[in-house]
Amino acid sequence: MNLILASQSPRRRELLGLMGLDFIVRVADIDETMDPGLDPFDEVARVSRMKALAVSREKGDVVIAADTIVVCEGKVLGKPRDEADAFRILSLLSGRDHEVMTGLTVLRDEEVITHTEVTKIHFRELYPEEIRAYIATGEPMDKAGAYGIQGGAALFADGMAGDYYNVMGLPVCRLAVTLRSLGLEIWGVRA
């Protein structure tokens, strides 16, 4: 049995490594476009399911796939296209609540388990100069919502409810429970 992470995200690799599991990375080549007319909660789950199905090849393999979005005032905020888009996104988040949603799919053979984890975040008021300085670090450019909570944006979030690691792109608590339900050991412990 292979444990496969269907993601090229270095943060997801790092977080899965915290669980003491040996895994291989197999990147899903799918269209991740979400339908803006559908509920983001359901859409992020659908994309994670598509990723898992795209890399599943051999019987017995366990595939982990995730997709993360940020939703603020009903708008889905993906990765910024450029620095101007990053500025627009971070300005929108300034002084507001938003939700980070991660669709998580674990697949083994015909069994497909999908959850959507939601973490609520509040950003304090941000100064335009600090937004520009943060963008200049390059950190926001490959992240949904144009920020990394584990990096410089830790200075922006003054409130959070839910799984911190979900904001980084992999809800590890939910994942551990799901993997154990399939009989996998985490840190040598089986459920």
Question: Which stretches of residues belong to each language-model region?
Answer:
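A short beta-strand-loop structural module common to alpha/beta enzyme folds
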Residues: I24-E32
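Residue-level detector of anion-binding/catalytic polar loops
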Residues: D22-I24, E185
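A generic short alpha-helical patch detector that favors 3-5-residue windows
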Residues: L21-D22, G148
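Cofactor-binding loop segments of dinucleotide-utilizing enzymes, especially the Rossmann-like FAD-
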Residues: Q8, A28, D109
